[in-house]
């Protein structure tokens, strides 16, 4: 990389750090081009990205954005995975890493909280924001459904009592 290109590359990484509340740092040594392309396509469908970074530039960008705590994670063949939706991204990366031993999760950061490999794996087991929204809507609808059911049961019970009383007479 030319010296004149380095500030532009640092600025790109700084923008990723600023715009993405969640970043996973990986080692990609041994992944084939088709595997990396497959991962990128999967991430793109979830509005996430995968960027191979030069460690020194990633450290400079981390220091410029106040993410000093992740600077020590940049060693070896490093790529960052970034997204605005942390759980979906974590699920995708963890599943890809399970299927491809050559992708190693090193650590990451979610909403300014540094996570290690195990924390990211645990984090990937959480429900996504859309799943949580669906659960909340379901919980809110459940009482209304029960009230309607009770009202219907009461009216049908009342109708049966009246029918039984009418058939006696």
UniProtKB/Swiss-Prot annotation:
- Family the UniProt entry places it in: Belongs to the universal ribosomal protein uL10 family.
Which gene holds the coding sequence for this protein?
rplJ
In the record, what terms sit under GO molecular function?
A: large ribosomal subunit rRNA binding; structural constituent of ribosome
Which keywords label this protein? Ribonucleoprotein, Ribosomal protein, RNA-binding, rRNA-binding
Q: Has keyword Ribosomal protein?
A: yes
Oligomeric and partner information: Part of the ribosomal stalk of the 50S ribosomal subunit. The N-terminus interacts with L11 and the large rRNA to form the base of the stalk. The C-terminus forms an elongated spine to which L12 dimers bind in a sequential fashion forming a multimeric L10(L12)X complex.
> What protein is this chain from?
Large ribosomal subunit protein uL10
PROSITE patterns xref list: RIBOSOMAL_L10 (PS01109)
Q: Which GO terms describe its biological process?
A: translation
- Pfam entry (one): Ribosomal_L10
Any Gene Ontology CC annotation:
large ribosomal subunit
Q: What is the role of the protein in this entry?
A: Forms part of the ribosomal stalk, playing a central role in the interaction of the ribosome with GTP-bound translation factors.
The answer to whether UniProt assigns keyword Transmembrane to this entry is: no
- InterPro entries from the xrefs? Ribosomal_uL10, Ribosomal_uL10-like_sf, Ribosomal_uL10_bac, Ribosomal_uL10_bac_type, Ribosomal_uL10_CS_bac
